[in-house]
Curated annotation (Swiss-Prot):
Family of this protein: Belongs to the UPF0756 family.
Subcellular location: Cell membrane
InterPro entries: UPF0756_TM
Pfam families: DUF441 (PF04284)
Organism: Acinetobacter baumannii (strain AB0057)
Protein keywords: Cell membrane, Membrane, Transmembrane, Transmembrane helix
Superkingdom to which the source organism belongs: Bacteria
Protein name: UPF0756 membrane protein AB57_2455
Amino acid sequence: MLAQFDVNLVVLLVLLICGLLSQNAAVTIAAGVLIVIKITPLNLIFPYIQAHGLNLGILILTIGVLTPIASGKLSGESILKSFISFKSLVAIAIGLLVAWLGGRGVKLMSSQPDVVAGLLIGTVAGVALLRGVPVGPLIAAGLLSLFIGK
């Protein structure tokens, strides 16, 4: 009986419940979709999701971030002013730092998969309990890489 116990499915169910209790749609939908994929023949797409999911997620996030520029909601004048405002210059510097940390995070997660579980648990807890957004694993891994020197 214990051989049939799927710890990964239980973890997904716990995440689904956490998402529901915290009213976090992102965690709820992600866990629900993954549960459906896991318990159906769709589980054959897991290698594809694992290979391309992160890049697809980053692409969708980038499209979302750039949409105000494309739609004109953020005017060209506002964009140009961002290069003369102190607050905007600090924002640009922080954006550069975060992008660099994210790059380090991707490398660390690829080279040291043993840290991925901890990063994911921390990120999901932050999303579910602190109403954060699930961009944390890359930045968290980037920060971790600074601490462990990788």
